[in-house]
UniProtKB/Swiss-Prot annotation:
<feature type="region of interest" description="Catalytic">
    <location>
        <begin position="552"/>
        <end position="852"/>
    </location>
</feature>
<dbReference type="InterPro" id="IPR019775">
    <property type="entry name" value="WD40_repeat_CS"/>
</dbReference>
<feature type="coiled-coil region">
    <location>
        <begin position="187"/>
        <end position="241"/>
    </location>
</feature>
<keyword id="KW-0677">Repeat</keyword>
<keyword id="KW-0597">Phosphoprotein</keyword>
<keyword id="KW-0418">Kinase</keyword>
<keyword id="KW-0808">Transferase</keyword>
<dbReference type="GO" id="GO:0031037">
    <property type="term" value="P:myosin II filament disassembly"/>
</dbReference>
<comment type="subunit">
    <text>Oligomer.</text>
</comment>
<dbReference type="GO" id="GO:0016208">
    <property type="term" value="F:AMP binding"/>
</dbReference>
<feature type="region of interest" description="Pseudosubstrate/autoinhibitory domain">
    <location>
        <begin position="500"/>
        <end position="551"/>
    </location>
</feature>
<dbReference type="InterPro" id="IPR004166">
    <property type="entry name" value="a-kinase_dom"/>
</dbReference>
<feature type="repeat" description="WD 5">
    <location>
        <begin position="1033"/>
        <end position="1061"/>
    </location>
</feature>
<feature type="repeat" description="WD 2">
    <location>
        <begin position="910"/>
        <end position="938"/>
    </location>
</feature>
<feature type="region of interest" description="Disordered">
    <location>
        <begin position="521"/>
        <end position="540"/>
    </location>
</feature>
<dbReference type="InterPro" id="IPR011009">
    <property type="entry name" value="Kinase-like_dom_sf"/>
</dbReference>
<feature type="region of interest" description="Disordered">
    <location>
        <begin position="158"/>
        <end position="191"/>
    </location>
</feature>
Amino acid sequence: MFNIKKRKESITGIPPINVNSPQSVPLSGTLQSPLITPNSPNFVSRQCPFKKFGCSSFLVSKAEFDNHLKDDAQFHLQLAVEKFDHQFDLHTQLMAHFTEQMEDQLEKTMKVVRNHTDSLGGNVQTKLDEGIEKCMAFAKKVEQQQQQLAKRLITQQIQEKKSTSSPLVKGGISGGGGSGGDDSFDGANISSMSTSKQELQQELQSLSIKMKKELTELSDELSQKLERSTGNIDIKIKRIEGEVNEKIDKRQLVSTIDDSIGKKTDSIGYTLESSIIKKVEEKEKKKSEQNQLLFDSKIESLKDKIKIIETQQLDTSSEVRKLKLESTSSGNLMAGLNGTSGRPSSSSHFIPSSVSAAANNINKNEIMEEVKKVEEKLQKKIREEIDNTKSELSKVERSVKDNRSEIEGLEKDCKNQFDKQDNKIKQVEDDLKKSDSLLLLMQNNLKKYNEFVDRERDRESERLKLQDSIKRLEQNQKKIEAEIQEGNEQVERVLREEASISPISSVPKSPITTKRSSIILNSPPMTSQQSSPKIQDLLSSSGSSSVSGINISSETGEMGILWEFDPIINKWIRLSMKLKVERKPFAEGALREAYHTVSLGVGTDENYPLGTTTKLFPPIEMISPISKNNEAMTQLKNGTKFVLKLYKKEAEQQASRELYFEDVKMQMVCRDWGNKFNQKKPPKKIEFLMSWVVELIDRSPSSNGQPILCSIEPLLVGEFKKNNSNYGAVLTNRSTPQAFSHFTYELSNKQMIVVDIQGVDDLYTDPQIHTPDGKGFGLGNLGKAGINKFITTHKCNAVCALLDLDVKLGGVLSGNNKKQLQQGTMVMPDILPELMPSDNTIKVGAKQLPKAEFSKKDLKCVSTIQSFRERVNSIAFFDNQKLLCAGYGDGTYRVFDVNDNWKCLYTVNGHRKSIESIACNSNYIFTSSPDNTIKVHIIRSGNTKCIETLVGHTGEVNCVVANEKYLFSCSYDKTIKVWDLSTFKEIKSFEGVHTKYIKTLALSGRYLFSGGNDQIIYVWDTETLSMLFNMQGHEDWVLSLHCTASYLFSTSKDNVIKIWDLSNFSCIDTLKGHWNSVSSCVVKDRYLYSGSEDNSIKVWDLDTLECVYTIPKSHSLGVKCLMVFNNQIISAAFDGSIKVWEWQSK
């Protein structure tokens, strides 16, 4: 056996494989890998260690393992970096989410705190006012007591004076009778007076002391009470500040600093600065003085030493001179002794020459040595002293340097301290400024609160007055009704008697005599008042008399002056008129009442001169001298009915004479604009009714002494409708009235606009004109505010386009039209025919279907797709709903097989950051990410591949949708980009429409819908690549859009779902039920399914628009998106799970 193995080894060169050994690798009909070398027989096949980061390679041999680690090191590093970026992005998103929640909580807490501070401020003010009032009352009481005490003291003094003066008088009388008088009694009186004065003074002092004590005690009590109240208030404020500090940043502290604290801080800052400066200056002075003294002392000591050295040098020089002199004198003596002068001396001794020479030499050497020694000593001393002086000078220099360094250090310390103090002072100043601003805000809030309270009080008083007036009016109405009933009975009796006597009516016949006579007979007749002599003369004539050629009926009525405005000549035409007014008004408003009236003829004003009737308005230059060309002659013939509008007695004071004429003039100007509008040949012509002012001269004048005024106009028969209001609100769906308002604004060069259009069909009355300056045209002229209201709410229609107004059908291209788009002034397109067809034919809110029953069925989770512990941001179907694609927060997307129990087929690393949106068409899968890119993927022969990366956005790409021709993407850069799928290039970018981040897109047939943080939904045409319309209504970010049939469903961060009718772009209803942001919604049959961040899924019945079913905890975290699959609902959530829901019987 051993030999056989050796033979195999010798032949093959490969050792045999031990089948029983655990380290052997079985060969299942295949050859062994050539990469397995004999050097690594124990290597076990494994996956790459960077599998956690996304590397999917499987390694068989050690060499392959080493080569893979070397070659793919950069790839592995890139994967690790992407994983880190992804985790960082998750962290930042979570932080952003938490910061948003914290901001919301802060706003709520700030509102609570503001309300609390407002209530506290009001309570504090009331308490302070009460305390001040009590103090004032107490002070008044004290003053009254003082006055009473003073009066009592004065009365006591007067009484005492009287009592003391009576004995004096008696003493004087008795003294006068005697001889001489007695002065002792006067002295006693004077002493008693002085004592009484002293006693009074003492009593006054004691009273003043008591009063002072009482005042001090009262003031102390008041101060203590005020301190307690202020202490309680301070404690409450501190508590509130503590609560706010726990919830709010230090930047947003709501604390009020008093002026005294500011003054104290300022004084403390200044005293600190002054004290520090003084101390530093004193230290510097002391140190400089000490250094100068030391330096001066050292210099003086050096000078003394130098003087000593100089004296020593002088002494040595003098000694040397002496020695030299001695040596010279000794030499001279020796020379005299040795010389031969020839003068012998008897007393001289004989000295040999050798002895003298030796003596001379000894003396010279000794002297020289001594001199040298002295010089050496001097030099040594000089050197030592020089060294000492140098060392001392160096020490002095060192000390000077040390002092300089110390001074510099002190200066630096002082500067640092000054800087710190400056910073502290600046902080205190900033705090004071903040406190001042907060105090101002508090004061403003208190003022507003006080104003609000005053207004409420005024309103309450007005309400009480109105209630009283209403009660009085009701009483008067009851009385008037009783009187009217009595008058009607009397009139009926008289009419019956007249009918029995003479069957012919006194009213002259006209083309509509039967109708008019029946109405007049059925209606209660008016009582004729006293008329002027001229009218009585006219009425006394037979049958029908004439006034300047115009026939006026002889029937009982009242006369009036008729005023008609001609807008062409801009003047008033003055006429006379006879009319008959019913007693009861047939309609009434807030200020005016309307009466049915019959015309009895119109004539000239020759019998009524201007001086007797008109006083102030209109002026003479505004009155036309010609009165023939007028409308009253034709429209107010004898027997015609019209409406008379008269102000109520309560509103007479508010209505001036000019107001009547302004109203009529305004209607005539609008009538002229109606004629201009009709000249443009609109689909329907319009007309404003004629209107006149009438002075009822037969009636008693008003309280201001002027005749009673009223306005009249023809009677409208039919349903009265209001098309738009004075504030620009559109009240009906009719196009002609709105187009007329737009027409007047454009053709007047934006100098006026006609609104408040109302009437029967296209016969209008009571309009209102707004002008930029707000002048003229009555009290309803709102100026620029009224014009802006119309501009922001008006939606142009086909009539606007037919009249070639300032709009363009099919989109807007110019800058002015872009502004109109943003403001809402654009053409309302008809998009229903080219929306995506739908099998759902339900009418939203129709309430035509039977009530849905959920007692026998539940929406249950029938399957949960494998979770990968990453949030699911988007899901989409691919390949005719055979595959489900899901985009995850780690930058990958996974493909699941629908028919194989939702098995995960592919996991693809798509982006460095999370995949926010995924979309599919028949050929491609599109993914978008916060890395500002869009990637295009294909699935072929069991493999996935990224074929293109679209780069163009400068912000996070939030959403993508696609059809077979174009891809649409929206981003945080506030743009929507259009990509051509044949070339994968950008062909269009919509900019400047959305003003904030764009969050979502929805595609239906030809049209694209977009929404975002600016709370507006825009409609786009994908063929003309232009914007058509916008819809406003949400109060927060628009998060998702879903289009079904002719309806658009939008969800928002404001926790609601809005349903829009795309036929007129109006909001049908708002569904409220979720308590957090609604992230997605879909429609299946008659039900709307909505998912929210409150973890719930709700079911809404579109027939009744009610929530009929709720799954409160559908996921552990918020629901991100919903989709419909056959009869099932698929939901994806932030917890990483994907669930399939289905209705099942219980």
